[in-house]
Structures are given as C-alpha cells and as structure tokens.
Amino acid sequence: MPIYTRYYIPDSMVFITCVTHRRIPVFENPQNIDLFWNTLAVVRKYYPFNMLAYVILPDHFHWLIQLPPDQPNFSHLIHSFKRNFTLNYKKDRQISEPVKIWQNRFWDHVIRDEEDLHQHLDY
C-alpha cells in the first residue's frame, strides 16, 4: 500500500469522503442514517468541529468541515466516527462476529481558496 501524507493545517476547511466496504449501500436503510447522526453527535463531543456542508449517499458520504485551531488532526475524528458507527451497528443488530462496513482509509482535500471552496460545495 502506498504511504499517504495528510496535511493538517490548523483552522483549515477539509473536504472528506468516506466510502463503505465494497460500496455496499449501507445508507439506503433509514435506520443506518439515524445511526449516522447519532454517531456524529457522540463523536463531536470529543472532536468538536464545524460542519459546513455534507451529503449522505447510499454507499459513501462527504463532509466539508472546519476544525478548531487546537485540533487540526481530522484522521482521529474519522477513525472515531467509523469505529463508533461500526460498533453501534453491530450492537443494534446483536452481531458478535467481525463486520467490515468501511473501506480502509478515506479521502481528504484541504480547501485552498474561495474558488476551491465553491467547487467542493457545488460537488
């Protein structure tokens, strides 16, 4: 696997994409969308950030977020979200064996300027 370099810039805006494992349409189920919002609320208590925009599609989601200047590491935020979502997904369904919901890693893009911001908002 290639090594990815993530750029953590305090107070920056970041466009993030997380995709489900094998692009399974997890978010076609309204119960999973509720779980998405509940997980997000819990994670935001530990990793506060501003949600500038979002979209939830059947097999992935996009966030445009801004982190506080003292917490620029969004990898911890994404790890926590994906982990908590998976744990609660299993708990709700009383699943004890391993379940893979997410693709490894995630895609991120640090917003460079106003034009870049508008391009990602329009996406």
What kind of region is each of these model predictions?
Residues M1-Y123:
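Short catalytic/metal-binding and nucleic-acid-binding patches
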